[in-house]
Amino acid sequence: EVRNTLIPLIKNMKWINLGGGHHITRKDYQINELKYFLNKVSNETNCQIYIEPGEAVVLDSGILVGEIIDFFKPSNELSPNIAVTDISATSHIPDVIEAPYRPALLNEPDKGHKVILGGPSCLAGDVIGEYNFSDIPKIGDRIALLDQAHYTMVKTSFFNGVKLPSIAIWDSETDNLEIIKSFSFKDFENKL
């Protein structure tokens, strides 16, 4: 069905880019079916077809470590707790707002204390999402969002001077942590 819709649209094109978001490195991705489909359509139309693997090259890798910098317990017990983190949805992980999507939290239990994680910026929508915690998080607690390697190089911003996270390589066997790149206010200033 997709083929029948696509062919009339691209038959007079030299090339087309079908974009990113193709998780071609996932174990369950039907890569052979995709190759067959793309080759068949390309041969029938003489149109060169491009796809962008995008995040597939780093899928399921990298963590974004942050810290709880403030905490609010609402007076209404039905409302969730709110933890402000040093991770900004708008500056560090904008797909949370744009896609929208909710990144996985390391060691999140199925049930627990419901906590909304928010960012430090002035943006009202700087919200990462609602998560379960075994214990109510405290100021200074660290959290880790999973599958975040694709944000180390693209889509980050210094929105209102929010500092970007450092990029580090961690060796899980030796527990060695090597900082590759750190950012400062000077980096923000130099972009202006």
Q: What function would you assign to each model-found segment?
A:
Residues E1-K73, N160:
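Active-site loop/helix belt of alpha/beta enzymes
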